[in-house]
């Protein structure tokens, strides 16, 4: 019984000590708030630099385990045969001589290893009709008056060089030409993602402002929330430069997910501040110091659980989970720090 009371006393004493440390930390943040704000804005510069220098990987297949037969085959194609990606170009309603000229232009594009069409096998002076039906049907479709051209690259499917080559080929070809294949799809995904991500992030921000303005007693406070969370998002995305690259899925989801996951922390801080204003009337600094202390105490446990959930993704054999898990775990940590400091 004595040991039980001793344990209870020590536990209570330890909690009081931790509470005092948190209040001391909160007072330090309030006291140096201007300096912290200046440093926070200054850190946006290297964060922005890191963001723009982080490569985005648009090849979802590269996150598959290396021991899969398909991945081994891809490596063999590149290493032993010097052929990585390939695309197919469907050409409609174009004269053979113009198609031949187009093939030569495409062959001159950087990182195009070869372009295979009829004139790769025979001279154009030889009519296609003399070809066996099996070979003729590979290149032509009489019903749609179209022909097929195969383009082989010396780089992998989602390499930056391959995507640049795809863009250049599209600049050479006309509206009569349709480029297909995984490399073309990856290039389209890149263009689509880059165009739409800012749009739906803006929608998320506007909806957050609208909801918070309707549910809170101030229309300005939501803007400060978003400023703090926005800076945390920039820090998180900028720190990805350490990883070297992130997937386009992670890039597309990270900002909106971090906004949704960490918004609660700022709301809790605001409500705690209002409660402490009633406790310490007329002393806003003291009220905020205690609000920061209360927020840290309550939010740390919740944030650790959230981080643990994202870390669990890192154990997937499909390493897209690792990519997304690490970025989002960092995002939660940056969100907590920004909430109680900025």
Language model regions located:
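Solvent-exposed, non-transmembrane loop/terminal regulatory segments of multi-pass membrane proteins
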Residues: 51-90, 126-142, 152-153, 157-161
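Extracytoplasmic
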Residues: 67, 71-72, 97-152, 187-191
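Short glycine/proline-enriched coil/turn segments at helix->beta-strand junctions
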Residues: 82-84, 95, 108-111, 171-177
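Short, solvent-exposed beta-strand edge segments and adjacent coil->beta transition regions
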Residues: 84-88, 146-148, 254-256
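Soluble periplasmic/extracytoplasmic beta-strand elements of cell-envelope proteins
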Residues: 88-90, 148-152, 178, 266-268
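Conserved short loop/turn motifs at secondary-structure junctions
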Residues: 90-96, 284
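Active-site-proximal beta-strand/loop segments in catalytic clefts of secreted hydrolases
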Residues: 91-92, 118, 152-154, 182-183
């Amino acid at each position: 019984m004595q040991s039980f009371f001793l344990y209870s006393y020590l536990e209570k004493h330890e909690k009081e000590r931790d509470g005092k440390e948190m209040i001391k930390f909160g007072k330090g943040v309030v006291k140096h708030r201007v300096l912290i704000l200046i440093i926070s804005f200054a850190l946006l510069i290297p964060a922005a630099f890191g963001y723009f220098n982080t490569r985005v990987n648009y090849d979802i297949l590269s996150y598959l385990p290396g021991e899969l037969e398909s991945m081994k085959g891809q490596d063999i194609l590149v290493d032993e045969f010097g052929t990585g990606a390939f695309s197919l170009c469907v050409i409609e309603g174009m004269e053979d001589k113009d198609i031949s000229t187009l093939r030569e232009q495409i062959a001159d594009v950087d990182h195009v290893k070869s372009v295979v069409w009829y004139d790769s096998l025979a001279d154009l002076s030889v009519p296609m009709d003399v070809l066996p039906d099996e070979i003729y049907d590979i290149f032509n479709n009489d019903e749609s008056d179209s022909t097929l051209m195969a383009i082989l690259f010396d780089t992998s499917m989602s390499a930056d060089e391959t995507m640049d080559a795809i863009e250049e080929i599209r600049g050479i070809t006309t509206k009569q030409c349709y480029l297909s294949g995984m490399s073309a799809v990856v290039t389209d995904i890149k263009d689509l993602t880059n165009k739409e991500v800012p749009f739906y992030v803006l929608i998320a921000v506007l909806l957050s402002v609208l909801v918070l303005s309707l549910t809170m007693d101030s229309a300005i406070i939501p803007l400060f929330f978003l400023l703090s969370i926005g800076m945390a998002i920039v820090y998180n995305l900028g720190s990805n430069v350490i990883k070297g690259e992130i997937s386009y899925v992670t890039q597309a989801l990270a900002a909106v997910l971090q906004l949704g996951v960490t918004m609660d922390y700022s709301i809790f801080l605001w409500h705690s501040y209002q409660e402490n204003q009633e406790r310490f009337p007329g002393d806003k600094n003291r009220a905020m110091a205690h609000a920061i202390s209360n927020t840290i105490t309550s939010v740390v446990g919740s944030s650790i659980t959230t981080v643990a959930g994202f870390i669990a993704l890192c154990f997937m054999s499909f390493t897209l989970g690792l990519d997304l898990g690490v970025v989002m775990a960092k995002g939660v940590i940056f969100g907590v720090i920004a909430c109680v400091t900025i």
